[in-house]
Amino acid sequence: MTLGNPTKSWHSKSTLTRVGIVLLILFAVPFAFTQKHAAAAQTIAPAAQVIQNLVLVGTSTIQATPLGSGVAQVPEIAADSFGDSSVKGAGVAQAPASPTSIRGHNLPIPSKEAARHSLAANAAVTANAAFPPPEPVVSSDSVVSFQSSGFRGFNGISHVDSRTANNGNQFSIEPPDQGLCAGNGYVMEAVNDAVRVFDTQGNPLTGVQDINSFFHFPAAIVRGTPNQFGPSLSDPKCYFDPQVRRWFVSELMVDSGTNAGATGRSFNLLAVSQTDHPTGAFTIFMYDVTDDGQNGTPNHAGCPCFGDQPLLGTDNFGVFQSTNEYGATSFNGAQIYAISKTQIAAAAASASAPLPVVVHIDASLQLLPFGGLSYSIQPATSPTGGGGVSEPESGVEYFLSALQFIDTFDNRIAVWAVTNTRSLSRNSPSLRLSFAVISSETYGQPNPAVQKAGEFPLGTSLSDTEEFLNTNDDRMNQVVFAGGVLYGGVNSLLKVGGAEQQGIAWFGVKPSFDDRLEGRVVRQGYVAVAGANVFFPSIGVNNTGNGVIAFSMSGTEYFPSAAYVEMVNGNSRPFVHIAAAGQDPEDGFSGYKQFAGATDGIARWGDYSAAVADGERIWFASEYIPKACPSVSSTTTPPCRTVNANWGTSVSAVHP
């Protein structure tokens, strides 16, 4: 369903230069919200820019490796990089007990956890309060049995594929974290912790390669006496840029565990193809995000830190990433990184080309007058490879972020811009960071999602009940800039059909510049299904606003499935199509209390889906639960699970 809404906004603009660490002061102009107010003429604490070095790691290709058996081994689940703990109770699913814990990535935003805990307390007073706004009451979309025009779909990488890659020198991991990119006749998928390339018919063009090997690092683990550990990689993203015709794959790397040669530092990784073919060579780069004042990083409070869930976007001139920065006991908000797109593409293709610099912008404090530290500032990608150029701004990359901090619901989002991105190719880049807070439809902290009852052998063996699915929070998901509009969506608690369900709030924001950044919600709406839950949206549209919102769906009548709604002229249609119907309940280790670090009864899911236009089709992928895993080397279809997990991914395409 689609809604319209004029918006009000609050603005700020800052100029960043290259000289050392440049402090910038942002001034809040008067603005009266219909909810929480920002005091007039505030001075926000200084933010900073630092110029960092990009480091060449090596070259790599996506290639087949021998497969392991997938039999549970010790250790089976990666020890948390931020503190080990022991298995409780039954141990690792029929394997001997060993020190294990759930991997620490895609961490919760502290203020959102407070909101989750206060949900019940706030519910009674919300209806009569001006802010937070009340829970949205929305109509239900219809689940239909037919597909959109030109639909095609196939199974992507599964847990079995990931666990057995590289001769089984992998851990069991939940959730997959969906990376997907398409272009030039290819489709690439990257998940935790494997990567593969397909043609547009779904035929595999490469084997499944483990992510560590692809990024030119030692295997996650080689079990033996003693065990040999590699660095921990997670949170994949990928993008084919039609402007420079190169493939970009990003990952977070934490190198502070027990691996041999560990540096005790954290990095963002970028793999850039040397040609427009993802089956060919990639060049691997990295830069430090530890932010402890060492190795050219700024000195942030509570660090050494790591940059959780690196997000990926581009405009005409730059490649942009943003992270949520965490220390051992601290949350430092959002950090933005910018690199010259043409220079990194040239450096990938030629060893003699100079390496570009990395411009690091601390964007954590800008939203303090509105409730808290900024988080998950999603950079936009574009069907054309450029975020748009406005000559006075000399290049601009746009971002969106959510604003729900400490209350259950909110009706504001933020639009951001980094301008003068043309300067990224110069010796002294000079960027300007701007943002505007605008009013929007209401959204708020989701609850875990129920799934259809079925067989769950792992949980049954542990005498546990069937799991719920973790919908995480209402941070902004993937953003695309198409036809002059920024599209993005969030998970949200909604009231539909008289009951609370987990749904999706989506936004279409038109940004503009007239001395300052302006933003206006020109389209928005909800995706909701009575008696079911939809979550982890990604919007893929072309420049006419035609495409899909992709997501996962579950409910008392639905096993976890991959689903979508169509977008037509920038508006969502009220029909939910099931791209791949789930065949069993989620039955993975991450929701069973016997595994250290697990959330009792709530399994990790997502943490995000992906959708992208390739010029002809809209490609999208989401997590779901398949019954069997078709084998490339055999005519049999074995069960799509190991002892510890059973997730799969579905890759689909439609003609917009």
Positions of PLM-derived features:
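N-terminal secretory signal peptides that target proteins for export/translocation
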Residues: 1-16
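Intrinsically disordered, low-complexity regions enriched in serine, threonine, proline
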Residues: 15, 33-34, 100, 113
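Bacterial N-terminal signal peptides
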Residues: 19-32
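Short amphipathic alpha-helical "recognition" segments used for binding
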Residues: 12, 17, 39-40, 139
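C-terminal PAP-associated
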Residues: 40-656
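C-terminal region of N-terminal signal peptides and the immediate post-cleavage residues
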Residues: 31-43
